[in-house]
Amino acid sequence: MERISSAPSISLGYPPTESSAHLAPSFSDSATSTLSFKSLLEDPVNPIRPVYTPTRTEITPVTLSPIPITPVREFQPYLHEISQEYARYSKQKRASLRRYLEKHGKLEGSMKESSINGSLLRRSSVSTILRPASESSYPNSNSETITYDIDDNVNPSSSLVDNFSISSVPSVFFQSDFNLDDPQIFDVVSEHIDITQTSDAPNSNRNLLLNNSMLQEKISWYLDTVELHLLQEIENASDSFPMIIDNLKQLKKETRDNVEETKHLLEKLTEVNVMCDRHMDAISSEELACHQLTQLKKVVQTLEDIYSEHKKVSEDVKDQRFLEAINGINSIVTQLKKKSTELNVDLLSLPSVKSLREEHKVLYHTVSQSVVQQFSKFLTSDMHKFSTILDSNELKDIYLSKNRLIPSVTKSLPSAMEFDADFLHEVDVCIDCLTLTDSLQAALTLYKTAVFEAFENLAQQYFTDGVEMRSVRKSSDLRRSLSAASLSSLSDSSRRSSSAANPFQSMSITEFAEMLTNIYFSSLECLRRIRSQIKVLIDILSKKDTKQYHLSVILNDLMATSSDVVTQQVTTINNLRFRVLDTYPPNNVIYLFSLHIIFHNELESLCGITQSSFIPTIMRQLLDWFKNFQRYSTQKLASSFERELWEAIPVEPSCQDLANRVFECSGNTPVEWTRLLSPEAEKEDENHRVHHVKVSEDCTATVSFGKQSLHIVRSSVTLLETLDDYGKLLAHFSRLAPEFQTGMLDMFRTLNSRVYQLILGAGTVRSSGLSKVLGKHIALASQTIALFQLSLNSMCRYLSRVTGTRLTNETNKLDQDFTVHHLQIHDKFVSLMRERVAISCSQIASLSWDIDSPHGYIIDLSKSLIKLYKVLHRYSQRDCVEVIPDVIRMFEDRLQLELTDIARNPSKWPGVRIDLSYFYDMMASKCGYAGDRTLLEKFERTPEQQEAA
């Protein structure tokens, strides 16, 4: 295409546009004269370099082919298919446009105020000759179809062809992969598929298109058509360009003014910004100051609350509300940490708070120490309070009744497991405080120490009270020294000094027993309470804090160790008292050592088996005392029988009770032996001797020993008392059985020898102070030996029953000795009467037989026999039954020997018969003899009968 002139020409026969129709005539003339087609292609704002553009006259005229108009309804099926995608696209497009307008709102405002014609703003930047005058509307995003505002029945211009159906458009244009870059699609669209591809060629030959002249000509024609259409479009828009250029100039001017004004505004704005920055800095500073002031107020308020709570904590500590104090301290620490986080201020680093924390540490330590002390004092106080519910006498009666040493009592021991609610609450609070202060271990250790000290003080206090009971009349200095003295120091001093320095020597047995009773039973009550306290503590620890439950093992040995402390104290006391223990009567020893054993048994029941030397020491002391008692009793009995006057004494009921107990012990242990009697006075021996010389209406002549009745002498009562003491000792202390058996046999052996020597020996008159030995002496000696034998058998059977031991050969031998000695006493009676009959019969040779009355010899013999009978019948009926017949037979034999020759003389026979008749009559009337008159019958028979006999 050749180059043509660029003179403007707009006479193409096209109708004028809407914009050119409204322009002023003057403006149109000037624009026509000044503008050219070339200027339309230049940059209207910045025409830096010219661009060559051909004029209309330079373009070869081409006949435009009409473009068919397709009605919108033809596109409805297609638009219906893409309605949803198009609706989303339209919605996004409108949103983008709205954001763009909001972003450039100022520019649009300035454009609206300019003199640009509004119609230019409504004109689209892209237009075609086929676009109608009215704008098409966007489809509604909620509708399923797309509609336009144009009318399908608009009559086209005369240059347009008739409507045709869209179905005549090749379907390739509606494919989703439509792309002219694709050679095959291009071949189909260009309708030259037969040129590029033969029937037998699988692929198109693109070189054929380059050599096809028809195709080249058609493409040129297409390009010319496109160019003409572009020129036509430009021509349609050319009428508006002058107005646009003028508006652009005006816009440039206004823009320069606006730029200047904007520059001034920017300078002012800069100043305003600087002032704003300063004001903002000031505001920030003020806000910061206000914030800091608010923070400071909050900090001050927090500190005020903290100090107020700290004051309350101090008051709680002063008032011993330790748990509230500990919780208050912990609450203060928690508040400080919480407020530090909330206020973003390290309150813990403040000097006042540091000082407060130091005070808290002091209070915490004070609370810890106070709670530890209070915990120990509270439990020990409860222990002492429980031990004083009952007094010592009531406790003694209950424990003795429990061990069947006295009759049953109505009262019982208070329950050690009963704790009131206040006690449990106090213990619970203390454990909470100890757990929070990590001082539970220290508290339990101190509690153990306090318990040990309490038991030491308990024994020491009762010991001091017992000493002061005897020292009340002494000077105050001595009493103070005794109160301050400890048991160990007193024990050491008593070993170094004489026995008179021992304060126990001045204590009576009643006072000493009362002291032991207080120590023993108060200690047992304290131990019972401690065991219950330990159970309560372990239960609370197991429920409250399992982490510190292991600390309860500290209390495992508390009971055993406490019992050891008590036993050490009482062992020391008993060792001190044992120096004067030999003077105690058996009842007192039984009472004291029964207390020891009861205390030890209760200790084992409460605390288990202990390793203390208490019971071995007690039993060793008891054995030593028993040996001394055995020796003393044997010597006392031997001396008593040695000085015995052998006079029968009346038997009082108390003596009969002694005999009954000794006799009954072989079958059943007498109740009196198992019962515990209170300590007796030291003048017990004198009181016992009073009833020996006192005769009352209740006294009897003999003592009943089972079915036998025996006359007793003064020493026999002492024997029964000694055996009664032996029985009590064995009933209470079965461990003494071997020593008991040995001592008892030694005692009976000594007594048997002593009685045998005194009664039957030659020194009787000198040792006893008797002028001569009479029949009653021998009869009472026989009764005494019978008492020995019966008592020995009964006591040996009692020993065998209680201890399960068999009778030894020594016992049988001693019993046989008693039998032999009894037979010897019988022989002694016969021997004495033989001497009397020898003296009396010496008169027979000088007698005259012609008198009618009994002779003197037979009268003397009858009197001697009657006297013997009376003595034996009164003092020993057993011997009377055994000895009188023997004496009568001895008399008959001697008389037969002396009177046989005389009786053969008929002149003398009547006198012999009178003597013998008198003898037998006196025996029958005075002695109750009912036997045959053997001698008289012999002398009355004839000589033949006598020879036959």
From Swiss-Prot:
Location(s) in or outside the cell: Golgi apparatus, trans-Golgi network membrane; Endosome membrane
Keywords for this protein: Coiled coil, Endosome, Golgi apparatus, Membrane, Phosphoprotein, Protein transport, Transport
GO CC terms: cytoplasm; cytosol; endosome membrane; GARP complex; Golgi apparatus
The keyword Transport belongs to this UniProt entry's keyword annotation: yes
Membrane topology: Peripheral membrane protein
Annotated stretches, region: Disordered: 1-25
Gene Ontology molecular-function annotations: syntaxin binding
Predominant cellular place of this UniProt entry's protein: Golgi
Modified positions (Phosphoserine) in chain numbering: 483
GO biological process, one term: intracellular protein transport
Domain of life where this protein originates: Eukaryota
Coiled-coil spans in chain: 243-312
UniProt xrefs under Pfam families: Vps54
InterPro entries membership: Vps54, Vps54_C
Family: Belongs to the VPS54 family.
Subunit architecture: Component of the Golgi-associated retrograde protein (GARP) complex, also called VFT (VPS fifty-three) complex.
Function noted in UniProt: Involved in retrograde transport from early and late endosomes to late Golgi by linking the vesicle through the t-SNARE TGL1 to the Golgi, leading to the membrane fusion between late Golgi and endosomal vesicles. Also seems to be involved in protein transport from Golgi to the plasma membrane and is required for the integrity of the actin cytoskeleton.
Protein's name in the database: Vacuolar protein sorting-associated protein 54
